[in-house]
Each structure stands twice: as structure tokens, then as C-alpha cells.
Curated annotation (Swiss-Prot):
Originating species: Papio hamadryas (Hamadryas baboon)
InterPro entries: Alpha-defensin_C
Keyword Cell cycle in record: no
Its job: Has antibacterial activity against the Gram-negative bacterium E.coli and the Gram-positive bacteria L.monocytogenes and S.aureus. Has antifungal activity against C.albicans.
BP-aspect Gene Ontology terms: defense response to bacterium; defense response to fungus; killing of cells of another organism
Family recorded in the similarity comment: Belongs to the alpha-defensin family.
Protein name in UniProt: Defensin-1
Keyword terms, alphabetized: Antibiotic, Antimicrobial, Defensin, Disulfide bond, Fungicide, Secreted
Domain of life: Eukaryota
Annotated disulfide bonds: C4-C32, C6-C21, C11-C31
Length: 33
């Protein structure tokens, strides 16, 4: 589990797996790698 802090993908406090940002189990947008 890695917390991603990105403003480009609106990913704040989300769970990131393999560089992919997930929101409540759903695929949001690619954030940090």
C-alpha cells in the first residue's frame, strides 16, 4: 500500500497499487508510479 499525493490526478490520500490510483476499490486515474 502506498499513499499517493498528486494534484494532477486528483489523487490525495488514495491507495495506490502498481502505480495505479484506486478509490474505494475502483480505478480512478493513473497517479504516481
Amino acid at each position: 500500500r502506498r499513499i499517493c499525493r498528486c494534484r494532477i490526478g486528483r489523487c490525495l490520500g488514495l491507495e495506490v497499487y502498481f502505480g495505479v490510483c484506486f478509490l474505494h476499490g475502483r480505478l480512478a486515474r493513473r497517479c504516481c508510479r
